[in-house]
């Protein structure tokens, strides 16, 4: 099987979650075997999203922030200003004829891209078995979650949804939910850890790492 081409990177800017969600599904409905893979960089206004495994009781008090049901995997999470969100619109059959065999490798590639992006800012992070996402591995914030991921993989091997990385956020809304279904799970962002950067810089860094990783 030939090496897949690098996905196209599109910057969608600040966009309501419902708009992006509808656009991802429409793109995936319309794509053909010739459609290029794409990575969408987005920043969302405040929103809580529920994955297919979500227990609505994990939204403790939404404080008038919209709560949107989605078709991604996983539990409840929060998106808001100052967070990098990258959606991966991919055809996994370009990597393996049986797309299901590539799904775990895809998650590993996403997680490693986040780990490598954070390492460039001297932030040490790690995976946790059975708990998708990226967590701080040392220091005062050890164990705090800094990135979340959730995907939809259709039966034809096409994916959407993706990964979020906290850069410079108001983290308070995370205390109004059980993030990813875990009670009292601490969350953190790069700014709180002393990283000197901008949202745009991290958006580009993570998108480029993902694009390169997915073309290997």
Curated annotation (Swiss-Prot):
Pfam families: LplA-B_cat (PF21948). Keywords: Acyltransferase, Cytoplasm, Transferase. GO terms for molecular function: lipoyl(octanoyl) transferase activity. Residues 33-216 form the BPL/LPL catalytic domain. One of its GO terms (cellular component) is cytoplasm. It catalyses: octanoyl-[ACP] + L-lysyl-[protein] = N(6)-octanoyl-L-lysyl-[protein] + holo-[ACP] + H(+). InterPro entries: aa-tRNA-synth_II/BPL/LPL (IPR045864), BPL_LPL_catalytic (IPR004143), Octanoyltransferase (IPR000544), Octanoyltransferase_CS (IPR020605). Substrate binds at residues 72-79, 148-150, 162-164. CDD domains: LipB (cd16444). GO terms for biological process: protein modification process. Signal peptide: none annotated. NCBIfam families: lipB, PRK14342.1, PRK14343.1. Catalyzes the transfer of endogenously produced octanoic acid from octanoyl-acyl-carrier-protein onto the lipoyl domains of lipoate-dependent enzymes. Lipoyl-ACP can also act as a substrate although octanoyl-ACP is likely to be the physiological substrate. PANTHER family: LIPOYLTRANSFERASE 2, MITOCHONDRIAL-RELATED (PTHR10993:SF7), OCTANOYLTRANSFERASE (PTHR10993). In the reaction, the free carboxyl group of octanoic acid is attached via an amide linkage to the epsilon-amino group of a specific lysine residue of lipoyl domains of lipoate-dependent enzymes. This is Octanoyltransferase. It comes from Janthinobacterium sp. (strain Marseille).
């Amino acid at each position: 099987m030939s090496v897949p081409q690098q996905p196209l990177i599109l910057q969608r800017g600040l966009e309501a979650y419902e708009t992006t969600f509808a656009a991802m599904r429409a793109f995936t409905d319309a794509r053909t075997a010739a459609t290029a893979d794409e990575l969408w960089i987005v920043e969302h206004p405040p929103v809580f999203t529920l994955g297919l495994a979500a227990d609505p009781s994990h939204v403790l008090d939404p404080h008038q922030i919209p709560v949107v049901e989605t078709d991604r995997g996983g539990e409840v999470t929060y998106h808001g200003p100052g967070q990098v969100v990258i959606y991966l619109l991919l055809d996994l059959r370009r990597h393996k004829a049986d797309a299901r065999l590539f799904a775990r490798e895809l998650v590993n590639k996403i997680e490693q891209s986040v780990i490598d992006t954070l390492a460039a800012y001297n932030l040490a992070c790690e995976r946790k078995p059975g708990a998708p996402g990226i967590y701080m591995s040392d220091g005062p914030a050890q164990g705090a979650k800094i990135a979340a991921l959730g995907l939809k993989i259709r039966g034809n091997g096409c994916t959407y949804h993706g990964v979020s990385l906290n850069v410079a956020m108001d983290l308070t809304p995370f205390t109004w939910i059980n993030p990813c279904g875990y009670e009292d799970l601490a969350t953190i962002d790069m700014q709180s850890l002393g990283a000197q950067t901008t949202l745009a810089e991290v958006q580009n860094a993570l998108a480029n790492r993902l694009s390169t990783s997915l073309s290997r």
